[in-house]
From Swiss-Prot:
Family the entry assigns: Belongs to the AB hydrolase superfamily. Hydrolase RutD family.
Keywords for the protein's UniProt record, in alphabetical order: Hydrolase
GO biological process: nitrogen utilization; uracil catabolic process
Protein name in the entry: Putative carbamate hydrolase RutD
Record carries keyword Ubl conjugation: no
Top-level class of the enzyme under EC nomenclature: hydrolase
Domain AB hydrolase-1: 14-115
Residues that span the membrane, as ranges: none
Positions of disulphide bridges: none
Length: 266
């Protein structure tokens, strides 16, 4: 699996791995790259079956497989220890990495994540699946911003959204791969295993997230033994895109604090 690695800003700089959500594209993290690369070696990637890592995914594709293939790619790149920043599905992959490779994951940042899929989130995806079956990729892509962004943010950026739609259609991961990745997301359940995650965790959520209620992050915080929760009042599901200034400050402070906390505990 292809990874994109930034040059380390100094010798032995900590590594931060960015894992996007269901869309799978590493470019999702563009608003974070410049600030992160000043302090960390940053790893981005298109998830298997998407972008520049094309593949046909098995029907039983799982979050555990997503975690394993990423860890193997990191080891092949010479990376043994890394912090993880995961958004939604990416946060699930991050938790799986922390469970399966505890000696490798130094810190976990969960952005609008959850223990197991909430009934409201499941309802949103049911609607989106019906759109995919009835209207194809175009209907899926055109509806997607409604679940990602606040209404006023979208209204002020109509040309940008049209350009994003065209790009998303041109690089659509395919109906079968999308549904298999979505099914993996829906099957994931960390409610009985989260207390085994021992690395320090920062939980970031947006109170106006339409897709994933912020209560999901509260449940996550209660279940994780070494976690802290930060709430953004505005930004929607893709709060790192809509309000990068606020998000980046939380992310940078969280990474620095948790990495220091971990080193002090060793």
């Amino acid at each position: 699996m292809k990874l994109s690695l930034s040059p380390p800003p100094y010798a032995d700089a900590p590594v931060v791995v960015l894992i996007s959500g269901l869309g799978g594209s590493g470019s999702y993290w563009l608003p974070q790259l410049a600030v992160l690369e000043q302090e960390y070696q940053v790893v981005c990637y298109d998830q298997r079956g998407t972008g520049n890592n094309p593949d046909t995914l098995a029907e039983d594709y799982s979050i555990a497989q997503m975690a394993a293939e990423l860890h193997q790619a990191l080891v092949a790149a010479g990376i043994e220890h890394y912090a993880v920043v995961g958004h939604a599905l990416g946060a699930l992959v991050g938790m799986q990495l922390a469970l399966d490779y505890p000696a490798s994951v130094t810190v976990l940042i969960s952005v609008n994540g959850w223990l197991r899929i909430n009934a409201h989130t499941r309802r949103c995806f049911q609607v989106r699946e019906r759109l995919l079956y009835s209207g194809g990729a175009q209907a899926w892509v055109e509806a997607q911003p409604l679940f990602l962004y606040p209404a006023d943010w979208m209204a002020a950026r109509a040309p940008r959204l049209e350009a994003e739609d065209a790009l998303a259609l041109a690089h659509f991961q395919g109906k079968n791969n999308l549904l298999r990745r979505l099914n993996a997301l829906k099957r994931a359940d960390f409610s009985h295993h989260a207390d085994r995650i021992r690395c320090p965790v920062q939980i970031i959520c947006a109170s106006d997230d339409l897709l994933v209620p912020s209560a999901c992050s509260s449940e996550l915080h209660a279940a994780l033994p070494d976690s802290q929760k930060m709430v953004m009042r505005y930004g929607g599901h893709a709060c790192n895109v809509t309000d990068p200034e606020t998000f980046n400050a939380l992310l940078l402070n969280g990474l620095a604090s948790l990495l220091h906390h971990r080193e002090a505990a060793l």
